[in-house]
Amino acid sequence: MSPAKQFRCIFTVMMLVSPVLVFGGDDFSRTDFPDTFVFGSGSSAYQVEGAAFEDGRTPTIWDTFAHAGEYGGATADVSCDAYHKYKEDVKLMADTGLEGYRFSISWSRLIPNGRGPVNPKGLQYYNNLIDELLSHGIEPHITLCHSDLPQALEDEYGGWMSRKIIDDFTAYADVCFKEFGDRVLHWTTLNEANVFALGGYDNGFSPPNHCSPPFGFRPCSIGNSSTEPYIAAHNLLLAHSAVVRLYRRKYKTTQHGFVGLNLFAFWSLPYTNKTTDIIAAQRANDFYLGWFANPLIFGDYPDVMKRNAGSRLPKFTRQESAHVKGAIDFIALNHYMTVHVTDSSSSLETDIRDFSADAAFQFILTDGATTQPGMYPVTEPGLQGVLEYFKQAYGNPPMYIHENGQMTPRTAILNDTTRVDYLQAYIGNLLDAVRNGSNVKGYFTWSFLDCFELLDAYGSAFGLYYVDLDDKNLQRYPKFSAHWYSNFLKGKGSKHSALLEIEDKVLHSSQSRSSS
């Protein structure tokens, strides 16, 4: 066994049998974090902008997916209408005390056909949004593609299944860097690149809805679950590295910004002390995180992926490996919960396999402190554990937490005490990670507003602010969590020290809403 493999197994065992050092507790505030650390909240273009058919925007693969009836007729055609209400929303961000706002640019709004002329109305909107944020002292953190590929490119050549996407994505990024880079320092190429490849090309639960029998969460009319996730991920990596090379060559010396990639990240722990489960937990990290992190740090896929997927996993040429290796200024994570992992190596004996069968493990949700079924467990070691893993396995690269938040039913409206408990636990856990030396630079809650959620449309809510979809003005109302986060950001301490003040504000907001 190589030294790297020995480390990974030993690290997994250590995380299982001994708790990570904890400094925190309930009493902490923004002032306990470095001044350079950024706290914010986030959104994405398709999920909040609305104005789906206005000012030159053309459909994305998400528009096509939603309009096909995947959510019983629900779409994001209007959603929060952030396209028209951005000034109001930025004012709320400033009042809350946000230091950063993570949002994405709609490729099909800026360049309607995916390539060619820039749409002046789209350009104006994003310039206005960026300037509005900066005028309120809020850093823009921009994602170039939050899974919303222009439908025109999907129709023309199959989108991320074709290497033609590399040139088009790089040209689109060039426009963004040229037009906005004088005011934007933090760029993320792709959101949840690992989940996009899986959901879009293996089990078909998200656009472009590719899968093949016996795999798939819903019927698919096209796809090959055994090969397409790996091909799409390969092209995502090549496109990302091309954009990073462009930025470093053309813009870095004048704009001084940073370009990273975003991954979805569970923290995976062995379900039992059995060696097979310990190895399975490491395999889960290799398949879900190492799939992208290994090429970006080391220049190639994890050995276990090459062994299990075999010829179905594309190979990097020597030049591609050199381009991908080191093509990262930071790695961003969307993290919501810890899972336990158990071995299912028997899946490797099947003749037809997809990504999950190659990974040969099963997820088991952990029991955690939560008050209602369907919500994420408040399992504190998760965030610190995954950051510690990146510190040890990948040399402690700069990290951002781009999404972290609690799911509640939309019917809960303003009384989201479970979200406050969740944020309290995870931000405290984040502080422990910072004090233990993790090179984490920022944290963004998901989400700032209740919006169109990509898993269930308007069935659940993650926002700090409730949006009344039945009101013609789509009125925003602060939840309990918005007041808690605001107090935290303004240095007023933990939930307990500000509880009475928050309860008074929430009661006032609830009464105002009831009388409107």
Predicted regions and their residues:
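Glycine-rich, proline-tolerant flexible connector loops at the mouths of alpha/beta enzymes
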Residues: 105-118
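Classical eukaryotic N-terminal signal peptides for Sec-dependent ER targeting/secretion
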Residues: 1-15, 21
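Acidic/polar N-terminal loop/beta-strand segments that form early-domain functional surfaces
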Residues: 42-44, 88, 104-108
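Short, well-structured secondary-structure segments
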Residues: 99-106, 139-143
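Active-site region of glycoside hydrolase catalytic domains
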Residues: 9, 22-70, 94, 113-115, ...
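Active-site mouth loops of central-metabolism enzymes
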Residues: 71-85, 161-163
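Intrinsically disordered, low-complexity segments enriched in Ser/Pro/Gly/Ala and basic residues
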Residues: 1, 17, 78, 310, ...
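Active-site-flanking structural segment that lines cofactor/substrate pockets
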Residues: 78-101
